[in-house]
Amino acid sequence: MSPAKQFRCIFTVMMLVSPVLVFGGDDFSRTDFPDTFVFGSGSSAYQVEGAAFEDGRTPTIWDTFAHAGEYGGATADVSCDAYHKYKEDVKLMADTGLEGYRFSISWSRLIPNGRGPVNPKGLQYYNNLIDELLSHGIEPHITLCHSDLPQALEDEYGGWMSRKIIDDFTAYADVCFKEFGDRVLHWTTLNEANVFALGGYDNGFSPPNHCSPPFGFRPCSIGNSSTEPYIAAHNLLLAHSAVVRLYRRKYKTTQHGFVGLNLFAFWSLPYTNKTTDIIAAQRANDFYLGWFANPLIFGDYPDVMKRNAGSRLPKFTRQESAHVKGAIDFIALNHYMTVHVTDSSSSLETDIRDFSADAAFQFILTDGATTQPGMYPVTEPGLQGVLEYFKQAYGNPPMYIHENGQMTPRTAILNDTTRVDYLQAYIGNLLDAVRNGSNVKGYFTWSFLDCFELLDAYGSAFGLYYVDLDDKNLQRYPKFSAHWYSNFLKGKGSKHSALLEIEDKVLHSSQSRSSS
């Protein structure tokens, strides 16, 4: 066994049998974090902008997916209408005390056909949004593609299944860097690149809805679950590295910004002390995180992926490996919960396999402190554990937490005490990670507003602010969590020290809403 493999197994065992050092507790505030650390909240273009058919925007693969009836007729055609209400929303961000706002640019709004002329109305909107944020002292953190590929490119050549996407994505990024880079320092190429490849090309639960029998969460009319996730991920990596090379060559010396990639990240722990489960937990990290992190740090896929997927996993040429290796200024994570992992190596004996069968493990949700079924467990070691893993396995690269938040039913409206408990636990856990030396630079809650959620449309809510979809003005109302986060950001301490003040504000907001 190589030294790297020995480390990974030993690290997994250590995380299982001994708790990570904890400094925190309930009493902490923004002032306990470095001044350079950024706290914010986030959104994405398709999920909040609305104005789906206005000012030159053309459909994305998400528009096509939603309009096909995947959510019983629900779409994001209007959603929060952030396209028209951005000034109001930025004012709320400033009042809350946000230091950063993570949002994405709609490729099909800026360049309607995916390539060619820039749409002046789209350009104006994003310039206005960026300037509005900066005028309120809020850093823009921009994602170039939050899974919303222009439908025109999907129709023309199959989108991320074709290497033609590399040139088009790089040209689109060039426009963004040229037009906005004088005011934007933090760029993320792709959101949840690992989940996009899986959901879009293996089990078909998200656009472009590719899968093949016996795999798939819903019927698919096209796809090959055994090969397409790996091909799409390969092209995502090549496109990302091309954009990073462009930025470093053309813009870095004048704009001084940073370009990273975003991954979805569970923290995976062995379900039992059995060696097979310990190895399975490491395999889960290799398949879900190492799939992208290994090429970006080391220049190639994890050995276990090459062994299990075999010829179905594309190979990097020597030049591609050199381009991908080191093509990262930071790695961003969307993290919501810890899972336990158990071995299912028997899946490797099947003749037809997809990504999950190659990974040969099963997820088991952990029991955690939560008050209602369907919500994420408040399992504190998760965030610190995954950051510690990146510190040890990948040399402690700069990290951002781009999404972290609690799911509640939309019917809960303003009384989201479970979200406050969740944020309290995870931000405290984040502080422990910072004090233990993790090179984490920022944290963004998901989400700032209740919006169109990509898993269930308007069935659940993650926002700090409730949006009344039945009101013609789509009125925003602060939840309990918005007041808690605001107090935290303004240095007023933990939930307990500000509880009475928050309860008074929430009661006032609830009464105002009831009388409107």
Regions found by a protein language model. Name each.
Residues 1, 17, 78, 310, ...:
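Intrinsically disordered, low-complexity segments enriched in Ser/Pro/Gly/Ala and basic residues
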Residues 105-118:
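Glycine-rich, proline-tolerant flexible connector loops at the mouths of alpha/beta enzymes
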Residues 99-106, 139-143:
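Short, well-structured secondary-structure segments
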Residues 9, 22-70, 94, 113-115, ...:
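Active-site region of glycoside hydrolase catalytic domains
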Residues 71-85, 161-163:
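Active-site mouth loops of central-metabolism enzymes
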Residues 78-101:
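Active-site-flanking structural segment that lines cofactor/substrate pockets
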Residues 42-44, 88, 104-108:
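Acidic/polar N-terminal loop/beta-strand segments that form early-domain functional surfaces
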Residues 1-15, 21:
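Classical eukaryotic N-terminal signal peptides for Sec-dependent ER targeting/secretion
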